[in-house]
Amino acid sequence: AANQHLCGAHLVEALYLVCGERGFFYTPNKVGIVEQCCHSPCSLYDLENYCN
């Protein structure tokens, strides 16, 4: 899949899809996934780094 900008609910949804039952770390007040995926586009591989 092409890299895409994912913010807010879209980002959480994508994490659910990628991580499934493993769950994930989502701390919106921390730098990291929002910088990586919202402010600039990220890939599914990037998202997988945030799975538990």
Swiss-Prot record:
Domain of life: Eukaryota
CDD domains documented for this protein: IlGF_insulin_like
Record-annotated disulphide pairs: C7-C38, C19-C51, C37-C42
Gene3D superfamilies hit by this protein: Insulin-like (1.10.100.10)
GO cellular component terms, A-Z: extracellular space
Keyword Secreted: yes
GO function terms (MF aspect): hormone activity
GO-annotated biological processes: glucose metabolic process
Transmembrane segments: none
UniProt keyword list: Carbohydrate metabolism, Disulfide bond, Glucose metabolism, Hormone, Secreted
Pfam families: Insulin
SUPFAM superfamilies: Insulin-like (SSF56994)
Localization annotation: Secreted
Family: Belongs to the insulin family.
Subunit composition and interactions: Heterodimer of a B chain and an A chain linked by two disulfide bonds.
Functional description taken from the UniProt entry: Insulin decreases blood glucose concentration. It increases cell permeability to monosaccharides, amino acids and fatty acids. It accelerates glycolysis, the pentose phosphate cycle, and glycogen synthesis in liver.
Protein name per its UniProtKB record: Insulin-2
Organism: Huso dauricus (Kaluga sturgeon)
